[in-house]
Design a protein with these regions (language model features):
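Non-catalytic structural scaffold of enzyme domains
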Residues: 1-256
């Protein structure tokens, strides 16, 4: 049907959701993607829930007017506080959120120490509390990392500045974490810096691949998969040439 050629919209507080977009494109290269990053208001993770809901609502309103066929909320903070509102407002629409990949982490390490590094809003949210309750584990450490998003937004994901930032955040956990859940879509871009601090023995988990698989499943069930040609369009509230250059770079970069 004609609607199957409409865009899959992917939204984030900035460029972090590109880590999810990469997984979507890898899994469904023939689809058409519209990525919107709200870098002018980043980070969401240090704002109030009310602010995040308002900004997410405004973004989705604009995108719905474009005739999109599905919405991927590729922002852990926006998913944590706004996904319920979006699903109530658009009950018949395909809306996929992202959540920290806690389930695979606790399944892999049922008796070992697992960390969840995320924004303060995500760590405080009821959605994460429910996720932890659904995946009981004897030793989960919550690790807030306010400031990490800003470094990724500045193009410093793999830099001495990122190392200096992460050292006090993750330093106390060196040799103590078997698994670390990356609870913000910006964080996978800092994988190299995280490994420099924690080493290679700590297994990193992020929810991008699972989100892409769920999106494919929902589109397939609805008969909305597209057979190409695929494309990716970037839009950003900052509307600055440097941010679009960063988007293209993050799409291509090997950050592992």
């Amino acid at each position: 049907m004609a609607v199957s050629a409409d865009y899959i919209a992917v939204i984030d507080s900035g460029v972090g959701g590109i880590s999810v977009l990469r997984e979507l494109v890898r899994l469904m290269p023939k689809e058409r993607y519209l990525y919107f990053g709200d870098s002018a208001n980043a980070p969401y993770g240090t704002k109030s829930a009310e602010e995040v809901i308002s900004m997410t609502d405004a973004t989705v309103k604009r995108l719905m007017a474009r005739g999109i066929k599905a919405l991927v909320v590729a922002c852990n903070t926006a998913t944590a506080v706004a996904i319920h509102m979006l699903r109530e407002k658009y009950p018949d629409f395909i809306i996929i959120g992202i959540e920290p990949a806690l389930k695979p982490a606790v399944n892999r390490f049922p008796q070992s120490t697992v960390g969840i590094m995320a924004t303060p809003v995500t760590l405080r949210g009821e959605k994460l509390k429910r996720l932890i309750a659904a995946n009981p584990h004897p030793d989960i450490r919550l690790i807030p990392a306010p400031g990490l998003v800003e470094l990724v937004e500045a193009g410093l994901a793999n830099s001495p500045q990122m190392d200096a930032f992460l050292t006090p955040v993750l330093g106390p956990f060196v040799g103590k974490l078997d698994g670390l859940v990356l609870g913000c879509t910006h964080y996978p871009f800092a994988t190299a810096a995280i490994r420099r601090i924690l080493g290679n023995t700590t297994v990193l988990f992020d929810g991008g691949e699972g989100t892409a698989r769920q999106t494919q499943r929902r589109l397939s069930d609805a008969g909305l998969l597209y057979d190409g040609p695929g494309c990716v369009i970037f839009e950003n509230s900052l509307d600055d040439p440097h941010i679009y250059k960063l988007c293209e770079s993050l799409m291509e970069e090997n950050y592992g």
